[in-house]
Swiss-Prot record:
Protein name (Swiss-Prot/TrEMBL): Uncharacterized protein SCO2049
Pfam families the record matches: Ribonuc_L-PSP
Family matches, as CDD domains: YjgF_YER057c_UK114_like_6 (cd06154)
Taxonomic lineage of the native organism: Bacteria, Bacillati, Actinomycetota, Actinomycetes, Kitasatosporales
Intrachain S-S bonds: none
Native source organism of the sequence: Streptomyces coelicolor (strain ATCC BAA-471 / A3(2) / M145)
InterPro entries for the chain: RutC-like_sf, YjgF/YER057c/UK114
PANTHER family membership: BLR7761 PROTEIN (PTHR43857), YJGH FAMILY PROTEIN (PTHR43857:SF1)
Amino acid sequence: MTSEAVRRVQSGSPWEESFGFARAVAAGDRVIVAGTTAFKGDMLYGEGDPYEQTKVAFGTAVEAIAEFGLGIESVIRTRVCLAHSRDVDAVGRAHKELFDSVRPVTTLLVVQGFIDSRVLVSVEVEAYRGAVDS
């Protein structure tokens, strides 16, 4: 694959600059979105609310795939990392509201924690340019 076949999008997160990564990368038919939280700039949305943090984080991820001309119907995989297993119902509810009509494969993990202890959820998304309903 040539470098011309790979495109990158930044979201403005300070961590992208600090750690040297892109919010999303398109390579061929795949678009992969990096771990995304409810931070926008230096502000955390939905502090203490895993449902709201999930919605905001997925919103940012969907904005990233939109930069490549894709919508939510193109999402084929999500991965959700939770700080607390007690939040699984709230996070699952937010995920279903967004993806019920799409039904991507999904992995939910409980992790030890995040860089900022106020973060309750981090999400990853993978989209496919050739996604179709079945």
